[in-house]
Amino acid sequence: MNHTDVPDLPDYAPRGALRGDGASSPPLHHKESPFFAADRAAFWRQLRELGPVVKIDAGDPLLRGYYLTRRDDVRAALLDPHTFASPPKTFAIQLFGAPLPQVPLSIGTRSEHARFGKVLHPLFSPRALAPFAGDLRARAAKLADKISDRRQCDAVDVADTYASQALFMVCGLPPDDARAAQMASAAVIGDTTGQAQLELVKWLNTSFDAGLSDPERPPGILWPLLEQLAGDKDFPLTQVEVASVILLLFSVAGIEMVASAITFALLHLARDPQLRAQLREDPAQIPAFAEEIFRLEPPGPAIPRVTTRKVEIGGVAIPAFSSVWLALEAAGRTNGGDEITRGSHGEVRRQRHWAFGGGMHRCLGMHLARLEMDAFLTEWLNRIPNFELKPGFTPTVVHKPTSVTHLRRLKLRW
């Protein structure tokens, strides 16, 4: 491979390993690499061995760029949005002839991001979410009870259903509305015309408008946001911005990431009967186990950034306006290792990770994700204590349009 543009990039060794085809070729992006699909731990381990910066110039042009693989470099980039900017993201929906921006993901300045954060962070705080913990557990228990007598299931379907129902419930909408769940799923998959997203927006607008006029509406974290938008002429967010935030929550950020984490947690537990028993006997360890799943199997293994100026990392020059991939999973595995971490007495111990990002773009829904994971895993283990992979079944990953890495299927039996 010719490295004349950046001559000090490391050689790609072992030859062809990261590509997975045995060829003497540069590595592919993790979304395209069969090596990642076969063994993601080995993929990131070998990527780190190539150096702190690894150039990807094969495969899909939209996925090419530079991987940052070291923990400290990833963390520094997350905390420096002026140099490593979040690329603009839009929905397929057109507004006044232009695509609707995905805010606050696409906001590039701290002051603008703070305008959103001041309104949104209190809605998704542990204190605001705490009243929903019991209902989230009840919802998980109901789903587990429904399938327990079947002696088998595709856990991906169960996790997707739970994540969807949980989000609708926490937001004050009917959790059992199958049509709403289908619309949310269609919006996640998306289409070039934006029709699926538009139908979801219309349904959300109708549902929230009806709720605002209903004094007996169920509780939900979005009601204060919508009430202030309607009644406060000095409210810091516009109606379009609030609509974009809500669409982002229901079509991109709020369902698939949690569903992915749940399925990978169940995959680990299906392979480890001792760990299942340990968590069942001591549920207080479940939050630490969930954090380890976020560290080892983050729904977004790497996130994109664009350099606003030339930078040098690990002796490698990265030009301005280059695509850079912050390898969150590689960063989390750097010091924590590739296995669930144990303490001196065998207890599950959480290690630091960056699955939720960092800095001003840190995931708004991280506390909700943790609450849902704890509720689901607790109730699942209470009702389905012993389970395993269905004989002959091999799990495979799939990369969703939202950039979430999910399992295609997870066939369990008990």
PLM region spans:
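Cytochrome P450
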Residues: 1-414
